[in-house]
Each structure stands twice: as structure tokens, then as C-alpha cells.
Amino acid sequence: MRLTALPAFDDNYIWALVANDGRAVIVDPGQAAPVLEAAQREGFTPVAALLTHHHADHIGGVAELQQHFPALELYGPDDERMPSATRHVAHGDTVTALGIDFAVLEVPGHTRSHVAYVGDGHLFSGDTLFSLGCGRMFEGTPPQMFDALQRLASLPGETLVCCGHEYTLANAAFALHVDPTNAALQRRQQEAQAMRHAARPTLPISLKSELATNPFLRLHTPEIRAAAAAHASISITSDVDVFAELRRWKDAFRA
């Protein structure tokens, strides 16, 4: 089994999990061309697609892929904005493909029906969890997004996080602004800079690393709580309120 990150648009990743027999699971194919080119180059055939949410940069390539692979199974949340999902999934469901059981987790916040998939030691988090950051809340509330991130944070530390975008360096700038003395975060930024300089993805990354470096997963720590309270100029007592302030801060942040 091999995992490949297929770049799409300016900063998206389409994930391809390819079995030894050439069958593949594709995650969030926002464009068809990167998948078709990789399938021809590497000799794999997509048999299933896991869709995390309805945004076009995550599902825009589905129709063309169906033309090339008519037997393609399409899994996604039950959302009228995702007519491409032919097999609806919900929290607690299991999707079996390539002999792998992918657990479905509801993670609303970025969108109201967003889901994530966990299987074969990988977390496909869509736009909920990024390396060193998290997604914007276009439809959800801070408590929903907080709960979603806590759900993902509870997975085993060796889980490899496969995000929907290459946002690591931009997120690192904010994370270091909030948590400037975090040595693990400083190392992660340096490693990510070297990876991008070599035109390599900064993903996947272990959840253990994210728990040590991602401010949105470190809301309980004195450093993050103090930074959020100082920015808000008020006393903040709950982790949800710390998250809400941190997300507002990130939305307005310019490096």
C-alpha cells in the first residue's frame, strides 16, 4: 500500500491510497487531471472516492472521473450540495475499500456536514484539521469546531494526518506568533521550509507532532490560554472560548 499526495489548484492535495494490485482510493478529487495523469503514470485504477465536504475544490473532478471510471464508488455526507456522493455516510459508519475499514467521523465546523475518514493509520481530515492550524468556520460554530478538533485529537498519536491543503508554512507564521518559545514548533517550521524548498509536501504529519505544535490542539496549555487572553484583553476560562478567540485572531492575522 502506498500513499501519494497529488497537487491540485494552487495548494490543494488530492490523496491517492494505492494497493499493490493497482486499485486505488482517492480522497477529495477537486480536479480530475491530477488523478488521471497519476493513474496513467503509476498504473492504478480508482475504485472508490472518499469525499469530506461539498466545496468545489474537493469534489469538482468527480464527474470527469466517473466518465473514465464508471464503477467508481463515491462516498460522502448526505448533503444536497453533494449530489456526486452516491453512497451517503454518517458518524460511526465504516467504508470498506481495498480491504481497509475507514471509520467515518462527523467533524462539522468548516461546513455543517463535513466528515473525516480514518483507516490504515491515516486521517483524511479535509479542511477541518491542517498542519499547525484548522479550517475556517464557514457554516459551523466555535463549539462545533472545537468538538470536531477534540475528536480528531483523541486518535492515536501515530496516526498520519493527511490534510486537504498545503498551508503549513502560512500556519506556522501564526502559530509562532502565538507560541514563540515552542521548540518543537520552531523545528517543524524549519523542516517544512526545507521540504517546500525541495518541492516536497509537508504532509502527511503525525498527530503526535501536531499535538505538540498546533495551537488549535493546545488550547489547554498555559502558553496558548495566556496568548488568547492577552489578545482578547479579557479573562478566558474555557477551552471553547480560547478556541473562538484564537480562530478570530487567525482570521485577521497577516504575517
Swiss-Prot record:
User: Which residues are involved in binding Zn(2+) 1?
Assistant: 53, 55, 110, 127
As cofactor, the record names:
Zn(2+)
What molecular function does GO assign, one term? hydroxyacylglutathione hydrolase activity
List, in alphabetical order, the GO biological process terms annotated in this UniProt record: methylglyoxal catabolic process to D-lactate via S-lactoyl-glutathione
Enzymatic reactions: an S-(2-hydroxyacyl)glutathione + H2O = a 2-hydroxy carboxylate + glutathione + H(+)
The cross-references to CDD domains, in alphabetical order and at most eight, read: hydroxyacylglutathione_hydrolase_MBL-fold
Q: InterPro entries in the record, alphabetically?
A: Clx_II_MBL, Glyoxalase_II_hydrolase, HAGH_C, Hydroxyacylglutathione_Hdrlase, Metallo-B-lactamas, RibonucZ/Hydroxyglut_hydro
HAMAP family registered for this protein in UniProt? Glyoxalase_2
Q: Assembly and interactions?
A: Monomer.
Name of the molecule in the record:
Hydroxyacylglutathione hydrolase
The top of its lineage is:
Bacteria, Pseudomonadati, Pseudomonadota, Gammaproteobacteria, Lysobacterales
